[in-house]
């Protein structure tokens, strides 16, 4: 019978053909307050469908049967004594297949058990109610831990998915956690979700949270999975195309059962505060020629206070949106005749160039050599690098004299050509090539978002070619560069993640192990906390991912440090060792800013348009008290401009002095220089800040000297009183 069901599905072409047959009344009895499904009691919400889709009951029936078999199998397992070691070295006794992380947490304190979101067992996240299977090292993670947040938001996505099914009976697709929150994709034959539906879905969310539905884990065979999800073509596709193991896991909370690796929070009651934030359309697996889906986004927290704080930050973020500030401050704009490519006004270009200049100065101090490479290459280069096979859909292609060329989406293959063009010896390494070349990526028009997702951009791209024994020191220097730029100059905090060998890796295990050990040693030597992401590395080498947090507590991934063993092989790169024998160099991909466009967007929003002096396109403005001092004002302007600073002066402004000062402050000029007869006589200017702090008379030569220090040392808050003492 199961085979017949499966054969029916593989021949079905459209989801519409599988939707209606399962829309029948549930046979389960119900009351005014509760749903009863196969003996399970669940709170009703006023906005629930009546009746629920029949697939919910059929799914639960199969679950109950298989779960009973699974529980009996676990109960029959022989339990053996084990030791559970905590991070502080304390050891707790337990038993295999019986003792759970939650029980250990309760032994320590009830408060810890209640606050814990998820467990980490032998380095892998683990359900709090899932029994240990052997001796274990145990960590208990709270919501402030990044991995715990991802689990919490993943569980919240399941709660949202349950509400979506109960509200309109759609077929769920993918529902992952994202950098901040989560989403769920749903297909529906004839229903469109809009913001007016959010409060109604939220009522069902609240009912699910009130029930404290347990998150339960079950391993199922592929055959049983096809039977359970036969009503949903999208799940059938995942099962048939993505699952290559005899068994996989599903999780249940209340009426929802879904394909999922887990782990999850203990029960839905942990999600005390949730908000649906927006909706959008999407395509199945991101393919434009596939079915159109509906996507709901959400955010959640363990308490309502955190949700309110987050909502306040979102209100502030809306005010600081870089697209809004870019327009208000005359920084950049976009035009339909060149989508995804920014037009930079002079003030925006000033910021852009200052960021590039900052990196250039660091390159000189840190041993990087800047190179210039072509924008366009014959497709043979991209075939050698592998990009033509795996990335060509995202490239802009051009035919030149009957041969196909591609605009470069990254610099690394060109740098490989440069390294391979001349012979090298071991004592010449490392080579550190840096490149600000223009890159192009053929992003879909619907994905373009201001400066954060563009088609034309520049990166502070660098590639280091080094020996195996130089990896650790090079990584250490890269981390030092990041720390200086992010923390000391931009004022960000950042986190480090080490992503190691994935399943489909290229190369030999010994080389990978050595590289991962080098990265681990460099991270440990940095003295910073870092997180291991097993199996999340690139196929060509392990990497360090860097996530920054801005003034609005938002996280962004900009920088990266990646080891690459494959491109040197593909381009047959070599150097001569001390014995005169050819050896293969290691390649390190490295960026600090990442895309200059994207970093400009992040900084615009983080600073809220109040640029630090060294980056500011509006460093100072002259305001004169009387027309008799205009000649002196123009002389001041000339000296400050020739010293290399941005200064403005309107001779014939008809506004009062107070109004001019206020306008300059709102325009975020760092300093307002007021000039009257006294200042002209003394050769000074009267300095005010954009925050209306009066710093008094300052001699012009002394002011220029201060400006130089502010710019050269990247002083963050030049308006502070101690800077003017």
Curated annotation (Swiss-Prot):
GO process annotations (BP): determination of adult lifespan; threonyl-tRNA aminoacylation
Cystines in this chain: none
Species per Swiss-Prot/TrEMBL record: Caenorhabditis elegans
One of the record's GO cellular component terms: mitochondrion
Keywords: Aminoacyl-tRNA synthetase, ATP-binding, Cytoplasm, Ligase, Nucleotide-binding, Protein biosynthesis
Catalytic activity: tRNA(Thr) + L-threonine + ATP = L-threonyl-tRNA(Thr) + AMP + diphosphate + H(+)
Gene3D superfamilies linked to this entry: 3.10.20.30, Anticodon-binding domain (3.40.50.800), Bira Bifunctional Protein, Domain 2 (3.30.930.10), Threonyl-trna Synthetase, Chain A, domain 2 (3.30.980.10)
Boundaries of every TGS domain copy: 80-142
Enzyme Commission identifier(s): 6.1.1.3
Name of the protein this chain belongs to: Threonine--tRNA ligase, cytoplasmic
């Amino acid at each position: 019978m199961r085979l017949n069901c499966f054969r029916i599905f593989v021949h079905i072409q459209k989801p519409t053909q599988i939707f209606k047959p399962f829309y029948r009344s549930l046979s389960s009895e119900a009351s005014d307050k509760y749903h009863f499904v196969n003996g399970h009691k669940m709170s009703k919400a006023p906005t629930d469908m009546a009746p629920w889709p029949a697939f919910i009951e059929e799914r639960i029936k199969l679950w109950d049967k298989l779960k009973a078999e699974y529980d009996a199998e676990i109960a029959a397992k022989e339990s053996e004594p084990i030791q559970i070691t905590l991070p502080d070295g304390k050891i707790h006794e337990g038993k295999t297949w019986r003792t759970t992380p939650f029980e250990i947490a309760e032994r320590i304190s009830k408060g810890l058990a209640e606050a814990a979101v998820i467990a980490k067992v032998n380095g892998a996240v683990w359900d709090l109610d899932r029994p240990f299977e052997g001796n274990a090292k145990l960590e208990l993670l709270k919501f402030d831990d990044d991995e715990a947040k991802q689990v919490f938001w993943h569980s919240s996505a399941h709660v949202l998915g349950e509400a979506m099914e109960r509200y309109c009976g759609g077929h769920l697709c993918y529902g992952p956690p994202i950098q901040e929150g989560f989403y769920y994709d749903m297909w529906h034959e004839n229903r469109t979700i809009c913001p007016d539906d959010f409060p109604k879905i939220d009522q069902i969310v609240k009912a699910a949270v009130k029930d404290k539905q347990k998150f339960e884990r079950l391993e199922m065979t592929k055959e049983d999975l096809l039977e359970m999800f036969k009503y949903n073509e999208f799940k059938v596709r995942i099962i048939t195309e993505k699952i290559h193991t005899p068994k996989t896991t599903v999780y249940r909370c209340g009426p929802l059962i879904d394909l999922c690796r887990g782990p999850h929070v203990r029960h839905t009651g942990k999600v005390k505060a949730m908000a649906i934030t927006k909706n959008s359309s999407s395509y199945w697996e991101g393919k434009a020629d596939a079915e159109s889906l509906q996507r709901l986004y959400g955010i959640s927290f363990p308490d309502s206070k955190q949700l309110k704080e987050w909502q306040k930050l979102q209100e502030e973020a809306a005010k600081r949106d870089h697209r809004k500030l870019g327009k208000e401050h005359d920084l950049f704009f976009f035009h339909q005749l060149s989508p995804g490519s920014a037009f930079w006004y002079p003030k925006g270009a000033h910021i852009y160039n200052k960021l590039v200049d900052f990196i250039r100065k660091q390159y000189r101090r840190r041993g990087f050599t800047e190179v210039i490479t072509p924008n366009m290459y014959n497709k043979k280069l991209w075939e050698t690098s592998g990009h033509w096979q795996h990335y060509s859909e995202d490239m802009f292609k051009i035919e030149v004299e009957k041969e196909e060329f591609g605009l470069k989406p990254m610099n690394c293959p060109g740098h490989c050509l440069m390294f391979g063009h001349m012979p090298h010896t071991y004592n010449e390494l490392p080579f550190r090539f840096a490149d600000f070349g223009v890159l192009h990526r053929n992003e879909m028009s619907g994905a373009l978002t201001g400066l954060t997702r563009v088609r034309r951009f520049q990166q502070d791209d660098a590639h280091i070619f080094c020996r195996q024994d130089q990896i650790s020191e090079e990584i250490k220097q890269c981390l030092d560069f990041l720390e200086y730029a992010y923390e000391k100059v931009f004022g960000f905090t950042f986190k480090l993640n080490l992503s190691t060998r994935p399943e489909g890796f290229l190369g030999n295990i010994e080389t990978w192990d050595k590289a991962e050990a080098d990265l681990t040693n460099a991270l440990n030597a940095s003295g910073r906390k870092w997180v291991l992401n097993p199996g999340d590395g690139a196929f060509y080498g392990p990497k360090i991912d860097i996530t920054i947090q801005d003034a609005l507590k938002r996280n962004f991934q900009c920088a990266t440090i990646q080891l690459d063993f494959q491109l040197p092989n593909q381009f047959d790169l070599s150097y001569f060792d001390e014995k005169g024998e050819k050896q293969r160099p290691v390649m390190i991909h490295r960026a600090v800013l990442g895309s200059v466009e994207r970093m400009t967007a992040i900084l615009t929003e983080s600073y809220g348009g109040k640029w630090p002096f060294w980056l500011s396109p509006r460093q100072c403005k002259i305001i004169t008290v009387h027309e008799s001092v205009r000649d002196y004002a123009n002389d001041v302007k000339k000296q400050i401009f020739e010293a290399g600073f941005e200064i403005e002066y309107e001779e014939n402004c008809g506004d009062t002095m107070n109004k001019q000062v206020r306008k300059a402050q709102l325009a975020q000029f760092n300093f307002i220089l007021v000039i009257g007869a006294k200042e002209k006589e003394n050769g000074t200017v009267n300095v005010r800040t954009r925050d209306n702090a009066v710093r008094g008379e300052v001699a012009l030569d002394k002011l220029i000297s201060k400006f130089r220090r502010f710019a050269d040392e990247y002083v963050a808050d030049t308006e502070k009183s101690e800077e003017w003492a």
